[in-house]
Each structure stands twice: as C-alpha cells, then as structure tokens.
Amino acid sequence: MALRSIKSIAGSCLCSRQRRCGSSAAIFPEGIFRCLSPKFGQEFPE
C-alpha cells in the first residue's frame, strides 16, 4: 500500500524523479522518488 510506504519513510529524503535513490526507493503518485535509506539524505533539483 502506498500510504503505508509513505508513513514508513516519512522524513526520508526526496529525490528527483530522474535520479536513483539507491537500491530502496518507492515511486509515489506524484511521480517523485522517496529514498528509504537515511544515507541518501540529499535532495536533487529537477
């Protein structure tokens, strides 16, 4: 469930939809990636 994923990674970094966030990333309806790992704690501009 997308909602469960959002809750589980709340506060994680946001990544550009064109960038890879690492091995663990979830695609959201907005079309952005949210990194699941805190070590990818950077934001990439579009």
From Swiss-Prot:
Write out the entry's keywords from A to Z: Cytoplasm, Nucleus, Transcription, Transcription regulation
Which GO CC annotations does the UniProt entry carry?
A: cytoplasm; nucleus
Entry's Gene Ontology molecular function annotations: histone binding
- InterPro entries for this protein: SEHBP
According to its UniProt entry, the protein's GO biological process terms are: regulation of transcription by RNA polymerase II
Q: Where in the cell is it found?
A: Nucleus; Cytoplasm
Domain of life of the native organism: Eukaryota
User: What is the recorded function of this protein according to its Swiss-Prot or TrEMBL entry?
Assistant: Plays a role in transcription regulation.
Q: What else is known?
A: Encoded in the 5'-untranslated region (5'-UTR) of ZNF689.
Subunit record text = Interacts with histone H2B. Also interacts with chromatin-binding proteins HMGN1 and HMGN3.
Q: What is this protein called?
A: Transcriptional regulator SEHBP
Source organism per entry reads: Homo sapiens
